[in-house]
From Swiss-Prot:
<protein>
    <recommendedName>
        <fullName>Protein new-glue 1</fullName>
    </recommendedName>
</protein>
<dbReference type="InterPro" id="IPR054054">
    <property type="entry name" value="Ng_1-3-like"/>
</dbReference>
<feature type="repeat" description="3">
    <location>
        <begin position="47"/>
        <end position="54"/>
    </location>
</feature>
<feature type="repeat" description="2">
    <location>
        <begin position="39"/>
        <end position="46"/>
    </location>
</feature>
<dbReference type="Pfam" id="PF21827">
    <property type="entry name" value="New_glue"/>
</dbReference>
<comment type="similarity">
    <text>To NG-2, also to SGS-3.</text>
</comment>
<feature type="region of interest" description="4 X 8 AA tandem repeats of T-S-A-S-A-T-T-T">
    <location>
        <begin position="31"/>
        <end position="62"/>
    </location>
</feature>
<feature type="signal peptide">
    <location>
        <begin position="1"/>
        <end position="24"/>
    </location>
</feature>
<feature type="repeat" description="1">
    <location>
        <begin position="31"/>
        <end position="38"/>
    </location>
</feature>
<keyword id="KW-0732">Signal</keyword>
<feature type="region of interest" description="Disordered">
    <location>
        <begin position="24"/>
        <end position="107"/>
    </location>
</feature>
<feature type="repeat" description="4">
    <location>
        <begin position="55"/>
        <end position="62"/>
    </location>
</feature>
<keyword id="KW-0677">Repeat</keyword>
<dbReference type="GO" id="GO:0005576">
    <property type="term" value="C:extracellular region"/>
</dbReference>
<feature type="compositionally biased region" description="Low complexity">
    <location>
        <begin position="24"/>
        <end position="69"/>
    </location>
</feature>
<feature type="compositionally biased region" description="Basic residues">
    <location>
        <begin position="70"/>
        <end position="107"/>
    </location>
</feature>
<keyword id="KW-0964">Secreted</keyword>
Length: 107
């Protein structure tokens, strides 16, 4: 029961943040996340989260001067591209009987 309340609150918060980000920004954002949990007799837990964000924006400004005899055009191009690497976090916990024997510092 407590977990479902927490999950609903988390989903609501993430929804509000995503709506706020989409309204505030006019750039293109691509995000992907994946999580994997594996538990066995040796109790190894692996959590992997990868996020890749690519942002690009471009603007073109054209200025013409009507007072001169020949038409002069100034075209300015702006282009920005940002790519961030994915982040991987790995947690390994050993709970087996063999690994407990190796942890004792008394003997």
């Amino acid at each position: 029961m407590k977990i479902t309340v927490v999950l609903v609150l988390l989903a609501t918060f993430l929804g509000c943040v995503m709506i706020h980000e989409s309204e505030a920004s006019t750039t293109t954002t691509s995000t992907s996340a994946s999580a994997t949990t594996t538990t066995s007799a040796s109790a190894t837990t692996t959590t992997s989260a990868s996020a890749t964000t690519t942002t690009s924006a471009s603007a073109t400004t054209t200025t013409a001067s009507p007072s001169s005899s020949s038409k002069k055009k100034t075209v300015t191009h702006y282009k920005r591209k940002v790519k961030r690497p994915k982040k991987v976090r790995k947690i390994t916990r050993r709970r087996g009987l063999r690994s407990r024997n190796g942890r004792r510092s008394d003997e």
